[in-house]
């Protein structure tokens, strides 16, 4: 449907009989109204053409071939005998055959039928509104029990004679009382049969009760009862402050309150959406278009397979026609009641065969696939054909970790990237006069020359991509990333963003989508980038946090020698190994440490002294609280105070000349990365301010 703001949307709800007629009925050019399916036949056994007024009728659902009627005629030029709009012989309109995908029909039921979704599903909406249990309602629905029928504020004979003590009485109890109370022939002429005047059963009984509901009164009474229960509970708590409160009574009160709250919500929903409760009882049964329930012939002259829905529709039409004939011939009441029950069971099997007491089965003892089975589940119409169907500019691959990526980046395999961005790549090649036409551009892409990869990287800079991992349970199931070309066939992902996707690197797959319009790209870059979705939308906790692998890697890279400062005297390496010095090397800056590591003069865990740029020792520790472990004097009068984690060089007068801290290569690299990250964040927050160098 399209609302007043031209937003396309899909809404599932109850439809009125008038709405069902509007979906199904259409007026032919000759003024005839078609749309009602009255025959159970589908195709003729000799011609394989749809039967007239059947569940595949071309007059109701449209022609099988575009512009060709059931007779085989078409509105040719100069053919005056054939109307340009429809065929006068068979009544089929000359329209596109795609109309059979959405044109519906309807079955006019001979008796009202209760919709099984609203009766047997949990919660049962009909039982909730009528304030009864589901078992109490199943008796009247399936004609096992009968309800007394009020007629225009006039008491019925049964009620006036006191036959009914309760609203629901068994049929076996009603008949003896009634027959002994008054002869059947004493009914006034024109008052109808016993069943029509005095009692109701089946969907008619439930429909009459739903029709008489006052939703606003239900809300008011439920709210008043809920308030009384709350006051009762508080009074019981005040009286039983020192004694144990009866848990059974509390549980009964809690359940009753929950029932009242659910009933008020349901009644408010009906009022807000202008839906009548009586629409839960069907008088008109919609018939799906032929395309979702096809009949397919396997090969030339082979077997014909049909959807299970066609067989279920056939049973409904057969039983409905039987009841119509019984009512027309004034058949026996017992036969009418039994046929009403059969129609209710047939409609139940059509809508939801799995919820029935005894599901309808085929000749191979397999349950028929009902309408609910067609639309629900992973392989249903919604998830597989509407939400999960394949679309252009999308791909799919396995995810692996990408430790070299930033949080907002993802590694896109070159084979996938060149296919996803092929249209943009062709336009860029032609626009830069690298390729003269479309054919040459496609040929260059097939050859995959160096110039193609350069242009592709430039194209990808302006196009974020969307990654989606099924099932998409919240908004972080789809996030935007800046694609980076990588080798291989797997999508590379930063490990910190896996929390939002609920993904791990044990074979999980993700889908890739390319936003095309400018609005979609702007939304992806501003709202959907992973660096802007760091908190959980449900509870607000951080969701992009370091994983266990990252924490373990940081621990391994920053671990230090267990001997600490005493490694100066007792070096862990053997004295005969000349590649290691007996003393820790000293370095002036970070760059000197990393240069020595690249030249393999030291390894990742080698202990070393690194000059600290700040003279203020309060950053490191308190000088007054820690005594030096060792003091080394030099010939010029300067001396070194060796502490556990740092070394201070002082002059003759005791002034501090410089400070060296004890660290390792791994800790130096980690400190450098953290410093650059904090500096980058600070510069992005204050771009016009010159910030001092940060020390960690």
From Swiss-Prot:
SMART domains per record: RPOLA_N (SM00663)
Subcellular location: Plastid, Chloroplast
Keywords for this protein: Chloroplast, DNA-directed RNA polymerase, Magnesium, Metal-binding, Nucleotidyltransferase, Plastid, Transcription, Transferase, Zinc
Database matches in SUPFAM superfamilies: beta and beta-prime subunits of DNA dependent RNA-polymerase
GO molecular function annotations of the record: DNA binding; DNA-directed RNA polymerase activity; magnesium ion binding; zinc ion binding
Cofactor binding summary note: Binds 1 Mg(2+) ion per subunit.
Catalysed reactions, as listed in the record: RNA(n) + a ribonucleoside 5'-triphosphate = RNA(n+1) + diphosphate
Annotated positions binding Zn(2+): 69, 71, 87, 90
InterPro entries: DNA-dir_RpoC_beta_prime (IPR045867), RNA_pol_asu (IPR000722), RNA_pol_N (IPR006592), RNA_pol_Rpb1_1 (IPR007080), RNA_pol_Rpb1_3_sf (IPR042102), RNA_pol_Rpb1_clamp_domain (IPR044893), RNApol_RpoC1 (IPR034678)
Coiled-coil regions, chain positions: none
Pfam families reported in the protein's UniProt record: RNA_pol_Rpb1_1 (PF04997), RNA_pol_Rpb1_2 (PF00623)
Positions annotated to bind Mg(2+): 504, 506, 508
GO CC, alphabetical: chloroplast; DNA-directed RNA polymerase complex; mitochondrion
Enzyme class name: transferase
UniProt cross-references to HAMAP family, sorted A to Z: RNApol_bact_RpoC1
Record protein name field: DNA-directed RNA polymerase subunit beta'
Organism of origin: Pinus thunbergii
Gene that specifies this protein: rpoC1
């Amino acid at each position: 449907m399209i609302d007043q703001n031209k937003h396309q949307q899909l809404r599932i709800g109850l439809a009125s009989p008038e709405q069902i007629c509007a979906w199904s009925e259409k007026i032919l050019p000759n003024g005839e109204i078609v749309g009602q399916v009255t025959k159970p036949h589908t195709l003729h056994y000799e011609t394989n053409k749809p039967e007239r007024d059947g569940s595949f009728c071309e007059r109701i659902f449209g022609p099988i071939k575009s512009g060709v009627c059931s007779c085989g005629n078409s509105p040719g030029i100069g053919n005056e005998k054939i109307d340009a709009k429809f065929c006068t012989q068979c009544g089929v309109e000359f329209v596109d055959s795609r109309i059979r995908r959405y044109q519906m029909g309807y079955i006019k039921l001979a008796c009202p039928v209760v919709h099984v979704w609203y009766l047997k599903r949990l919660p049962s909406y009909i039982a909730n509104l009528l304030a009864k249990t589901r078992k109490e309602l199943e008796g009247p629905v399936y004609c096992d029990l009968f309800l007394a029928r009020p007629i225009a504020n006039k008491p019925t004979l049964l009620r006036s004679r006191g036959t009914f003590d309760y609203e629901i009485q068994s049929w076996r109890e009603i008949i003896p009382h009634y027959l002994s109370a008054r002869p059947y022939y004493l009914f006034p002429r024109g008052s109808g049969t016993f069943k029509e005047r005095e009692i109701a059963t089946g969907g008619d009984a439930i429909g009459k009760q739903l029709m008489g509901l006052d939703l606003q009164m239900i809300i008011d009474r439920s709210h008043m009862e809920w308030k009384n229960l709350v006051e009762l509970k508080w009074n019981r708590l005040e009286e039983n402050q020192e004694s144990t409160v009866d848990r059974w009574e509390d549980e009964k009160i809690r359940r009753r309150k929950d029932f009242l709250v659910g009933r008020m919500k349901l009644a408010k929903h009906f009022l807000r959406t202008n839906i009548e409760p009586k629409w839960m009882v069907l008088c008109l049964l919609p018939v799906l278009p032929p395309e979702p329930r096809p009949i397919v012939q396997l090969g030339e002259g082979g077997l014909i397979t049909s959807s299970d829905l066609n067989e279920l529709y056939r049973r409904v039409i057969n039983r409905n026609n039987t009841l119509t004939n019984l009512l027309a011939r004034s058949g026996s009441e017992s036969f009418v009641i039994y046929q009403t029950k059969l129609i209710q069971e047939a409609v139940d099997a059509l809508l939801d065969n799995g919820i029935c007491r005894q599901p309808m089965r085929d000749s191979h003892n397999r349950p028929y696939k009902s309408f609910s089975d067609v639309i629900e589940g992973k392989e249903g119409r919604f998830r597989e054909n509407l939400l999960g169907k394949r679309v252009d500019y999308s791909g799919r691959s396995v995810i692996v970790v990408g430790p070299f990526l930033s949080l907002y980046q993802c590694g896109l395999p070159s084979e996938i990237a060149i296919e996803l961005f092929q249209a943009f790549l062709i336009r860029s090649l032609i626009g830069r006069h690298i390729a003269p036409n479309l054919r040459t551009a496609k040929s260059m892409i097939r050859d995959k020359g160096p110039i193609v990869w350069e242009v592709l990287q430039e194209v990808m800079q302006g196009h974020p991509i969307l990654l989606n991992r099924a099932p998409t349970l919240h908004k972080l199931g789809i996030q935007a990333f800046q694609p980076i070309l990588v080798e291989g066939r797997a999508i590379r992902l930063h490990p910190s963003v896996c929390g939002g996707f609920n993904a791990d690197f044990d074979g999980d797959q993700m889908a890739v989508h390319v936003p095309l319009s400018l609005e979609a790209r702007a939304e992806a870059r501003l709202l959907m980038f992973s660096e802007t979705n760091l908190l959980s939308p449900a509870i607000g906790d951080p969701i992009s946090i370091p994983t266990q692998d990252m924490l373990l890697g940081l621990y391994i890279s920053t671990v230090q020698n267990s001997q600490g400062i005493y490694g100066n005297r007792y070096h862990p390496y053997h004295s005969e190994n000349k590649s290691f010095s007996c003393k820790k090397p000293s370095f002036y800056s970070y760059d000197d440490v990393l240069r020595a590591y690249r030249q393999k003069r030291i390894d990742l865990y080698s202990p070393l002294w690194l000059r600290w740029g700040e003279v203020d020792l309060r950053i490191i520790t308190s000088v007054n609280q820690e005594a030096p472990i060792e003091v080394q004097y030099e010939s010029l009068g300067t001396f070194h105070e060796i502490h556990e984690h740092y070394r201070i060089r002082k002059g003759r007068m005791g002034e501090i000349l410089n400070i060296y801290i004890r660290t390792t290569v791994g800790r130096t690299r980690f400190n450098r990365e953290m410093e650059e990250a904090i500096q980058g964040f600070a510069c992005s927050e204050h771009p016009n301010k010159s910030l001092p160098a940060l020390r960690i």
